[in-house]
Amino acid sequence: MNYTNDAVALLSDMITVESFSREEKNVADMLQRYLEERGYIVSRSGNNIWLMSPGFDPERPTLLLNSHIDTVKPVAGWVRHPFTPVIENGKMYGLGSNDAGASVVSLLHAFMWLSAQPQSYNLIFAATAEEEVSGKNGIESLLRELPKIDFAIVGEPTEMHAAVAEKGLMVLDCTVYGKAGHAARNEGENAIYKALTDIEWFRTHKFDKVSELLGPVKMSVTQISAGTQHNVVPDKCSYVVDVRSNELYTNNELLSLIRQQVKAEVEARSTRLSSTATPLQHPVVKQARSLNRTIFGSPTLSDQALMPFASLKMGPGHSSRSHTADEFIHIHEIEEAIDIYIRLLDGLDIRF
């Protein structure tokens, strides 16, 4: 079987189907039909589909191959039609081609090859929803239905290098209170001035623990709002902080430390998007090194954050093409990805 041609044809079909986050039903339907027509037993939960290699044995470790089928909405500036796949000069253009359709089809066809050979592990392929919005009806909900997972490959555009660690995300809504007064008189307590002290702390503070792969925790104040009119001293100032955690702190630990240092009332929108890190001695990581894959820590978030087990983020394409006009994937990147996934995992003992 020519897996590359089949993978490219499937990606072309996927591009024609709108699959914005939380609206993935039609592309999930299409993938389900594609697999059932080829004799695979497909399971489904909402807009997530998965299949297992034959002969599942609970005594063996289980390896998950996962990528997402949702896309962002097309940005301004597209010259080509985002839902019309076009191949020009070895590139396939279309929305979701790079992020992360190429990973979906490459992992799927690697699954087909690997599951046809004897392996020392169970293999599951899952195409999941809501990754782009860190939704709760994607991989997070699906993991409750799957057997225990020992390791996962998460397909995202990394040029087929291996992200063994990933920064987490916590968004903070912060509110500082003052006292209203007339701006012409020396009265009131300016909430903006109180907030400035907090904001300077967020700008300059360095947490003690620095990760070898991910570096320091990064905090950025990204939004601020205060005041009702020019002549009233504001009694309230609200601001938003984007916190990118490393694996040496949980989000709850960081939240507690931050609350001890600032005047604002601080509420986290969520603490569930944790930083992750896989030991460099893990057999899959060691195998990736042997294939001359660069081992690195990723500053960007993926479904890896929702996986409470060892994982590696690796997929065809380049992250700089994601969420851009005229998004594309090189055809040779899909061919290379299928080959590398197979060489990475075929015959490997993933126990650690």
What kind of feature is each model-predicted range?
Residues E36-Y40, S45-N47, E59-R60, A116-S120, ...:
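Short glycine/proline-enriched coil/turn segments at helix->beta-strand junctions
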Residues L63-L65, A126, I153, L312-M314:
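Hydrophobic/aromatic beta-strand patches that form the interior of the parallel beta-sheet core
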Residues N2, V164, D173-F352:
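Metal-dependent amide/peptide-bond hydrolase catalytic core
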Residues M1-P74, K236-V240, L254-L257, I331-I342:
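N-terminal helical capping/dimerization or prosegment-like subdomains
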Residues S12, Q32, V105-L108, M112, ...:
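Predominant activation on well-ordered alpha-helical scaffold segments within soluble catalytic domains
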Residues V104-V171, T175, F352:
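Acidic/histidine-rich catalytic neighborhood of metal-dependent amide-processing enzymes
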